[in-house]
Amino acid sequence: MKILVDENMPYARELFSRLGEVKAVPGRPIPVVQLDDADALMVRSVTKVNESLLAGKPIKFVGTATAGTDHVDEVWLKQAGIGFSAAPGCNAIAVVEYVFSSLLMLAERDGFSLHERTVGIVGVGNVGRRLQARLEVLGIKTLLCDPPRADRGDEGDFRSLDELVQHADILTFHTPLFKDGPYKTLHLADEKLIRSLKPGAILINACRGAVVDNTALLTCLNEGQKLSVVLDVWEGEPELNVELLKKVDIGTPHIAGYTLEGKARGTTQVFEAYSKFIGHEQHVALDTLLPAPEFGRITLHGPLDQPTLKRLVHLVYDVRRDDAPLRKVAGIPGEFDKLRKNYLERREWSSLYVICDDASAASLLCKLGFNAVHHPAR
């Protein structure tokens, strides 16, 4: 049994070798000759999986170690009798922590408290729900918009997108990309929406590039609209609009979900799905794969305020470390993918062990996802 895996899937060789012969290959472009004798294909979002790639190939199963699936033609796979699995929620925590890192940086730069802001969350799936929960731990008001969930009668106080645009100081997108249909998200943030945002609003896109109309956004910024912008995803990736990058406050190369934990979850989820598919079901404990974190432990004295939270968050991950490299190489062919391929190891907040002498600080940090304990000062 031959299993092709994307060379940038951590732990893929280690895990899938339990099931058969493993061949690690580039994801973009994928070497199609390797598909001629392969039984399974494990990809990331950079690989377009469709009839033109797999027609006439012996592939029986495709797994994507990503939450999103718009790079996979699921309808054709089903028609072709090819098994499929994604990794929903695998990188949700990472994306939430990316958003926090960005917001805390902007808050420090511009001198505002997040408690004074209302956050509109568009798309309330694995990422949106977790983001809402962490914001509410800190007492930050959130507004939710998710028409599919609202129409299904899912639990939640869902509002219209127009209401979020009217009332939110921060608008952050966490939707799939639907190019048509009743829940179309292609250019959901179009020129009309962007122009309607509150003066001084913050716009964040960490889902799919085409959810925000990049041309319209650049037009509005060029005309001087007072707007802070955080973009992790871009229309036309791996190409991007260099002029837009120059205008945004934070620009990164589609790495919001790139924690070691998130990548490992993606790999283990598709590994478990494939092992079940072939009748050799196996389960993997994530903590048996992950290395010890860079920071063993730190001590926090006193209560948790926004500047202290910012220091803790940026100790684990400061979004500016990914903004600067992209600006240096933007526009050079191949460099966008190279930044992603050679991405420095990044951990989640749970990797940081925080000893607090303040009980309320320890409680808040635990609810936020840190590994925190309370030890009263002596």
UniProtKB/Swiss-Prot annotation:
The name this protein goes by in its record:
Erythronate-4-phosphate dehydrogenase
Q: Which top-level group of life is the source organism from?
A: Bacteria
Any one Gene Ontology BP term: pyridoxine biosynthetic process
Kindly name one Pfam family recorded for this protein: 2-Hacid_dh
Q: What is its main location?
A: cytoplasm
Q: What class of enzyme is it?
A: oxidoreductase
List the molecular function annotations (GO) for this entry.
4-phosphoerythronate dehydrogenase activity; NAD binding; protein dimerization activity
- UniProt catalytic activity: 4-phospho-D-erythronate + NAD(+) = (R)-3-hydroxy-2-oxo-4-phosphooxybutanoate + NADH + H(+)
**Which residues does the Swiss-Prot or TrEMBL record annotate as the active site?**
R208, E237, H254
Query: Gene for this protein?
Result: pdxB
Concerning InterPro entries, the annotation shows: D-isomer_2_OHA_DH_cat_dom (IPR006139), D-isomer_DH_CS (IPR029753), D-isomer_DH_CS1 (IPR029752), D-isomer_DH_NAD-bd (IPR006140), Erythronate-4-P_DHase (IPR020921), Erythronate-4-P_DHase_dimer (IPR024531), NAD(P)-bd_dom_sf (IPR036291), PdxB_dimer_sf (IPR038251)
